[in-house]
UniProtKB/Swiss-Prot annotation:
One MF annotation (Gene Ontology) recorded for this entry: ribosomal large subunit binding
A single BP term in Gene Ontology: translational termination
Keywords assigned by UniProt, alphabetized: Cytoplasm, Protein biosynthesis
Source species of the chain: Streptococcus pneumoniae (strain ATCC BAA-255 / R6)
Pfam families: RRF (PF01765)
Listed PANTHER family: MITOCHONDRIAL RIBOSOME RECYCLING FACTOR PSEUDO 1, RIBOSOME RECYCLING FACTOR
Tagged with keyword Cytoplasm: yes
Gene: frr
Top-level division of the source organism's lineage: Bacteria
Localization per Swiss-Prot or TrEMBL: Cytoplasm
Annotated family: Belongs to the RRF family.
Presence of the UniProt keyword Lyase in the record: no
Main location: cytoplasm
Functional description taken from the UniProt entry: Responsible for the release of ribosomes from messenger RNA at the termination of protein biosynthesis. May increase the efficiency of translation by recycling ribosomes from one round of translation to another.
Source organism phylogeny: Bacteria, Bacillati, Bacillota, Bacilli, Lactobacillales
UniProt name for this protein: Ribosome-recycling factor
Length: 185
């Protein structure tokens, strides 16, 4: 039963890591990255559709994204969605593909994005700590219900703390790497 609590906590913490990685992917670092467009949805035949399902996204150069629609008739819809998005990038439509040139980041913008990265990383750590609290509460409930002994509870609490420490360290590493990537010129 104790292993179930730890496995459940590990699984939820892994989901937090994946969520953080998705968040970081959406923060542009001055170079082209297809995940920048993950949050862009296009109204395609009356349905909000993720851009990557109706077009291929390639990176021909370090700071250029090339969006090639599978269906040429959707080009105007894609252009409209990209203009409406909060990416801060103006699409260039040449009639068959859309080019997105990622502008170089100013020093001030880099610092602002680094602050945003820290905030997102801190939110992920809070989520991990909440998962730890839930796991600890579950362990205490089991001890109260006499499903585990007091010694087993102490061991379980140590194991939960170790898993939490590992998860927080991983988040710190991810945050530091993203900050480093942002602050590189």
């Amino acid at each position: 039963m104790a292993n179930v609590i730890i496995e459940k906590a590990k699984e939820r913490m892994t989901q937090s890591h994946q969520s953080l990685a998705r968040e970081f992917g959406g923060i542009r670092a001055g170079r082209a990255n297809a995940s920048l467009l993950d949050r862009v949805h296009v109204e395609y035949y009356g349905v909000e559709t993720p851009l990557n399902q109706i077009a291929s996204i390639t990176i021909p150069e370090a700071r250029v994204l090339l969006v090639t629609p599978f269906d040429k008739s959707s080009l105007k819809d894609i252009d409209r969605a990209l203009n409406a998005s909060d990416l801060g990038i103006t699409p260039a439509n040449d009639g068959s593909v859309i080019r997105l040139v990622i502008p170089a980041l100013t020093e001030e913008t880099r610092r602002d994005l680094a602050k945003e990265v820290k905030k997102v990383g801190e939110n992920a750590k809070v989520a991990v700590r909440n998962i730890r609290r839930d796991a600890m509460d579950e362990a205490k409930k089991q001890e109260k219900a006499k499903e585990i002994t007091e010694d087993e509870l102490k061991t379980l609490e140590k194991d939960i703390q170790k898993v939490t420490d590992d998860a927080v360290k991983h988040i710190d590493d991810m945050t530091a790497n993203k900050e480093k990537e942002l602050l590189e010129v």
